């Protein structure tokens, strides 16, 4: 295991819901605020994060833009993922 890496956090990103949750955490948005940005109810957003349902294609790019990640990363886990506060990595 890489020092400082949370294995649970890495395995949680293996699903669309896990990536949505991780990106929201990195964005420091509440579940309610994230849902409002995308135009859905909080229980819908929660279902997405917990893999009880998946957002339709019409929401994926809006979610990605709201959470400042790429649509590719959100869908597949590859590409530009979340940036945490204080992350000074240059792209």
What are these regions (language model features)?
Residues 5-6, 12, 80-91:
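Interfacial/linker helices and their anchor residues that mediate assembly or domain coupling
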Residues 68-85:
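Short C-terminal boundary/hinge segments that cap the last helix of small helical domains
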């Amino acid at each position: 295991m890489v020092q400082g890496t949370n294995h649970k956090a890495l395995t949680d990103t293996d699903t669309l819901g896990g990536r949505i949750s991780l990106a929201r955490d990195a964005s420091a948005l509440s579940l309610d605020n994230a849902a409002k940005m995308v135009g859905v109810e909080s229980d819908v957003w929660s279902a997405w994060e917990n893999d009880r349902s998946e957002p339709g294609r019409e929401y994926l790019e809006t979610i990605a833009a709201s959470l400042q990640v790429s649509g590719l990363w959100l869908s597949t886990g590859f590409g530009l993922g979340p940036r945490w506060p204080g992350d000074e990595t240059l792209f």
